[in-house]
């Protein structure tokens, strides 16, 4: 196995639980990181977190030198999924706005990074609950072993009040405090 070096890290994470029963990410002002106001306005919280961290990590690397974007999420864009499902039920499956569905797909962060930076390289997203980030790291290590040099590997997740209640009721959070971030 060849050596792998981490050249840059970025994180948006929780600092305290505040009033919520889970760790909620302390988000920065995204205006400096995601300069396009229209694009920023259309992005959900999770997409902003992931894209901001990805842009920070890739800011000194020319787009043509990025060999891979490998992202991971445990459950995906939950807020957008909830928004789409609620609209689906409220509108009886008619006259739906596709934006919430499009942004609820798991590969949105990797795709946004590729579009923003004009990166035409390997781009994959792992969705596997608790093993997603590990899968992304393994893929990144294997990519480097194959000769790729500049690989972005990252993860992001969000928690909504509804998803937190569901996970609690299913017993998925026993002995842990849930958290979100990128």
Stretch-by-stretch model annotation:
Residues 1-134, 142-149, 156-182:
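Conserved "HGTGT" condensation-loop signature of ketosynthase/thiolase-family condensing enzymes
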Residues 137:
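Short-chain dehydrogenase/reductase
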């Amino acid at each position: 196995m060849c050596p792998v070096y981490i050249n840059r890290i970025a994180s948006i994470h929780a600092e305290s639980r505040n009033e919520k029963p889970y760790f909620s990410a302390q988000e920065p002002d995204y205006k400096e990181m995601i300069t396009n106001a229209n694009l920023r306005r259309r992005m959900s919280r999770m997409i902003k977190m992931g894209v901001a961290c990805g842009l920070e990590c890739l800011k000194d690397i020319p787009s043509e030198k990025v060999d891979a974007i490998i992202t991971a999420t445990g459950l995906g864009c939950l807020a957008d999924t909830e928004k789409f499902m609620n609209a689906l039920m409220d509108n009886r499956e008619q006259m739906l706005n596709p934006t919430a569905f499009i942004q609820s797909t798991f590969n949105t962060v990797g795709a946004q990074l590729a579009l923003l930076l004009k990166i035409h390289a390997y781009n994959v997203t792992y969705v596997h609950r608790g093993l997603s980030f590990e899968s992304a790291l393994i893929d990144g290590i294997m990519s480097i072993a194959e000769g790729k040099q500049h690989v972005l590997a990252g993860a992001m997740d969000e928690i909504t009040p509804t998803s937190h209640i569901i996970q609690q009721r299913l017993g998925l959070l026993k002995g842990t405090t849930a958290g979100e971030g990128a």
